[in-house]
């Protein structure tokens, strides 16, 4: 069994930080999470400026956006279990260093390939930090109600970071250049490093359990194969299906190995807990729908409605405010209504809030947009908080790192696949919907069909009536693609809400006993 030795451990073995110390730890963890959450969405607003500067292809643009999530997802389980064994504080500090170096490299990337590589390194740093934030919360907040409050704050910060990312990106792109959205991380990390070294629970984790490197490798290759294969298959590459099947086979080998090992890397008994499974599934499917749509909506505001980066970010403020409100009130809703009602209600609210966007075209609807963003932000965050509280409360402390890593894997896998799948759907619908404009050559039309940002660039170069006609047609084609992704998301969210309503217990009592 793993035992954790930390500063501030009570004499009776209670691992909570004394007094207000644990709330200071929570503040630091939330600030770390805020940095990563902002980084996940800050690029959305910068896409048009980045496209104009680096001129990536549509495939390269999707890789720039979602390589972060595709790298984070397979590494979370490995780093989560390493944190359980060798110390979460060490992993967080190392993650800060990697994240800082990668941020500087991304800021000054001269080519799309260089930016993709830097974003991948950012994913490595993020994977080192994220599981530790949840598992340290689980470590220092042992009272379930107090932990629910802490998770509510953590969830609100995650929502605020993801929602405020476009606002930060809008301000930076408006006044500097697209690379500033990454460079801003460096001075923040310079402040975080000494603070984390002083505040986070120290000591080391002692364990007689061996750490199985082969299992770690299988989990990384399996998840990466699934994500990469699905992405490539969606883009029409024939090798994608082969990679997907290879990933599935590798994960099957991983599961088989975990069942045979006396000390598995991932305790599969966690998945025998209905609440744990419901939480993980809810996170995966909810984030899948949210992240891909958020990217499309950011482009819709700028390239279809004509907003500047800052104006688009301001329009998305209701999403941020509602997300914070959902994070802060979600714990109370969960206690009052239970897991089933809270999760299914949040999913249903999100699906209903997305539905009006199917009537939008190339004209703005500011009031309707505000109400839709409020419903989406609140519904998504309540769902994610309910899922997170259920996952961590149904898990003994010795497995907190594995549980946190599993949740974060679901989150990042959902984010990466959401961008890949929904982005691919948009591209598949957009390209054939953009008919040839008289007077514009085939080469220019092929470039315009790469993406709406490319079409805007071509239209600007052509100018005149032809350029205006091309931009108008491209905007209509993009709206058609956006509607397709919204339909897929609404169906997915609605189906998940029904599944939760019928299959999940009303109130989970798992996890009140922290013993393994």
Locate predicted features:
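12-transmembrane solute porter fold
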Residues: 22-38, 43-45, 58, 239-243, ...
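Central cavity-lining transmembrane alpha-helices of secondary-active solute carriers
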Residues: 66-80, 130-134, 317-329
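Hydrophobic transmembrane-helix bundles of small-molecule transporters
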Residues: 152, 174-283, 289, 296, ...
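Structural signature of transmembrane alpha-helices in multi-pass secondary transporters
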Residues: 36, 65-68, 72, 123, ...
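Extracellular/periplasmic helix-loop-helix junction of adjacent transmembrane segments
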Residues: 46-74, 305, 310-314
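Helix-loop-helix hairpins in multi-pass membrane proteins, especially solute transporters
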Residues: 81-214
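Helix-breaking motifs and short loop linkers at transmembrane-helix boundaries and internal kinks
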Residues: 55, 87, 108-114, 176-177, ...
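Interfacial helix-cap and linker-helix signal at transmembrane-aqueous boundaries
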Residues: 50-51, 82-83, 168-176, 230, ...
